[in-house]
């Protein structure tokens, strides 16, 4: 069992995040404590697993979801809440890797992913409060010019005209920071409360007939007909298995473990701001172009939710407040003395190419993971694609499975 599941968190308990505090009372679901059988067993109740469960249940499959902790416990319920466009790789580079035809089909899938996310929120989680707009903030004029060229390329070659280019003056009007030289706003992207979205998906999946067990970590998957999944107190026999664990993959499957690396990211929430427009003048999210990027937005109760800093080890730093305060005050020196009320970390999954991993990893066992920071849209869409595949239509899965993703050097040993 991977230490990532328990190294930084108490069992079956949400982290002390602003997201958890602002999501209301969420009673713990029952743990699996007996043998059960279903058509499909899904490991993990994040966006991928919950969307897969919902779409399979709507198709009439019997579905069991096993979650080691709580619904939305992992990256799905801890992230910056930003639903970006495309993959975490420039579309121009993807064209060179995959060819023009495949690149265009993949872009359309990422557009479908955003549309699906907005639709699921409207139907099942309006309290997630989706708002349009993500700014990409660039530190140097060279990076700004590259962002503008990207926007022009997407409009000319893909008909995507949702990006508004920003120069030094216009980005300074938008983001009250002296650090940026320009960038763009993607009005086709947006931001939301991720844990409320996950909780809404869970209720929708259960209403459709799926059964979700919390506090039910999977210890072993025995491949066969059927596949057998063993928890610490129960067992599931299932024709199909979906590994929807992302960075918390627990090394349950070697193919996934060698290609998807866990990485930790950290966030804080400030006390409510008296004047949020002293930080952001529009209700958008922002991500800058640092390699270890900073990302932020204003919450519905006027807090700055700010993410910055990362680590590759199992343990989080002892003082996340201090770790994140440094980049926060670098970007917003006017907030040097602001009170920080919440601090938390989370573990996501990345790949060598920063493109997601879609793969068949055993007999009637599928996975989608490694969204590399673009999981808010892609993970829910992956659930739809996994459900389509199990139902007999693997066209989109097969194309996504061709995305390049070599194993990390050292394979599983360096995790």
What do these predicted regions represent?
Residues 108-111, 139-146, 185-203, 213, ...:
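Short beta-strand to alpha-helix junction loop
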Residues 86-169:
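Dinucleotide-binding Rossmann-like beta1-alpha1 core, especially the glycine-rich loop
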Residues 29, 126-136, 170-204, 208, ...:
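Helix-loop-beta segment of a Rossmann-like dinucleotide-binding subdomain
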Residues 38-65:
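N-terminal Rossmann-like FAD-binding beta1-loop-alpha1 element of flavoenzymes
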Residues 58-78:
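Glycine-rich FAD pyrophosphate-binding loop
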Residues 115, 123-131, 218, 234-274, ...:
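Active-site substrate-recognition segment that forms the wall
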Residues 153, 179-239:
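Helical element adjacent to the flavin cofactor pocket in flavoenzyme catalytic cores
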Residues 1-40:
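Extreme N-terminal leader/targeting segments of oxidoreductases
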